[in-house]
Amino acid sequence: MKILVCENYDKLSEKAAQIIMSQITLKSNSILGLATGSTPIGMYKKLVEMYENKMIDFSDVKTFNLDEYQNLPISNDQSYHYFMDDNLFNYINVKRENIYIPNGMANDIENECIKYDNLIKEAGGIDIQVLGIGNNAHIGFNEPTVNFEKKTYVVELEESTKIANARFFNSLDEVPSKAITMGIGSIFESKKIMLLATGENKAKAIYDTIYGKVTPEVPASILQFHDDLIVILDKEAASLLNPKDYKVV
């Protein structure tokens, strides 16, 4: 595990984007695992800037997103399809046929989950998976008490997660109650994982993830066992960590 602490959110976003750029420079047909939520938005902006400055080429890249709400049309501005278009895909040269996001509108949702894992496998596996982390240390929509071996599956969202996401909707009632998410088992198969966190409200989750007992009660704690994990934090998210355990960048 490698832990980097940045001065602020902008520096964190820049560092994360540089790591993605390095991955694509080394392997032009990289398979990227992407996340939604507020944390990676700055990274996506930096990647768009890099593309506009001809520093990065996405034409051979494939992307797989972590999750999508169930029964929320992709045209809805709160769907993760919409989010990814609005924050990244509409502004870079990634091919539409190389973008994969779970289909939350699928008639056979269980089959959609199996199909999604198979698509990742057929692509050769994810080279680098971007993750955010919830206040309760969830990753993707893998909530506390999750089975660590689970592949992509349908999850009932915890009330705390719905409340956290309600800020993106007009009301709590509009937040979908279910989502398709890559399971911990699917995420863990990624060759490299990059976990991003900002703000004091994430400090406890980060502390438990790095120092705590590995337990389904803290879903992100399983990342302690991953062979190639990089954690990028701002000062606030790192506030509970021992300074000897991280590098300031």
Curated annotation (Swiss-Prot):
GO annotations of cellular component type: cytoplasm
Pathway membership: Amino-sugar metabolism; N-acetylneuraminate degradation; D-fructose 6-phosphate from N-acetylneuraminate: step 5/5
Role: Catalyzes the reversible isomerization-deamination of glucosamine 6-phosphate (GlcN6P) to form fructose 6-phosphate (Fru6P) and ammonium ion.
GO biological process: carbohydrate metabolic process; glucosamine catabolic process; N-acetylglucosamine catabolic process; N-acetylneuraminate catabolic process
Active site: D67, N136, H138, E143
Catalytic activity: alpha-D-glucosamine 6-phosphate + H2O = beta-D-fructose 6-phosphate + NH4(+)
GO MF: glucosamine-6-phosphate deaminase activity; identical protein binding
Lineage: Bacteria, Bacillati, Bacillota, Clostridia, Eubacteriales
Protein name: Glucosamine-6-phosphate deaminase
Keywords: Carbohydrate metabolism, Hydrolase
Family: Belongs to the glucosamine/galactosamine-6-phosphate isomerase family. NagB subfamily.
SUPFAM superfamilies the record matches: NagB/RpiA/CoA transferase-like
Domain of life of the source: Bacteria
InterPro entries recorded: Glc/Gal-6P_isomerase, Glucosamine6P_isomerase, NagB/RpiA_transferase-like
Record-listed E.C. numbers: 3.5.99.6
